[in-house]
């Protein structure tokens, strides 16, 4: 591993935040000259110590995995990204998900709408019904609870409203609104097309080709109770969050720093795809910028100036926000619990990590500039982990 005191300082600053109880992060260059990992804090209250090999919940980084599996199947002819959702799932199952002013536009929604967040569908997890709490707020306030895919869809149908009509799919100026409903539906599509579980699809189409041996998915049918006993705790403010039933309902994914490095590098280089890097380039085109949200949910989900393509984020600050030391752009994905996988093309760097805090979704974006500056000053001396 590489000795990197500047990155150690970044790690310590994150751990020093009042809302961060542990942190694990890694940075590696394409040529291996910089290869650093570090961890601080305990796995859970009372120990043991968190290590750079401890599995953790990756949150919405699973969207990058879902998109990768989708593109693998598309280039093999198993599905068509421009095919309608109702061609892959029972029309009765999805009917009424996108109704505005009495008009049901659900049948216009394609898989491409879902994977690019241009469907306009409400977010079953984060959006609030009129006079009520979001599903994630209910979980945080009332305790662990579970639901089926169809129960989540019924919530969208009966209690929430779409944000905008389904957009013109290939229009670079199309509206984009982050919604967990989009990718919940895509997971159902993956299962319908392959007649396999989501976990099996991920394992066969993504994890195995990329050598991700320590990544697993929990679900209502496959709880992985023994493996869950060893994962890093999630936190909600000052309290640990024990929500195994909720995590199984969302097909929660757990991984390690090493596997997340393998994921971001492998996808960017196109290793799972028959078309190689050219397929990834299609995933990453076009990028559209999220709008500015002003509701409570906007504090947790990605917004301006983050851009989105097909399950891939890009983050680059507008020049007017950083006129003198603008950090280079990164692509990858983040999660609402303060998780990140970033690839920086200009520096050929991969950056991954977690703070496991449900209030820390913005942390990766706020810290990225400091991390990239630290990598410029890091000397390639070979030593142990941080």
Give short role names for the model-derived ranges:
Residues 52, 57-61, 75-129, 188, ...:
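Active-site helix/loop module of the DD-peptidase/beta-lactamase fold
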Residues 20-22, 76, 80-82, 173:
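Short secondary-structure junction motifs
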Residues 35-36, 53-55, 99-103, 123-223, ...:
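Catalytic-site signature segments of enzymes, centered on catalytic residues
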Residues 114-115, 156-157, 283, 375:
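A generic structural signal for nonpolar/aromatic side chains embedded in well-ordered alpha-helices
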Residues 1-42, 53-57, 87, 174, ...:
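Catalytic loop of the DD-peptidase/beta-lactamase superfamily, centered on the K-T-G motif
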Residues 65-66:
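Active/ligand-binding-proximal structured segments within catalytic/core domains
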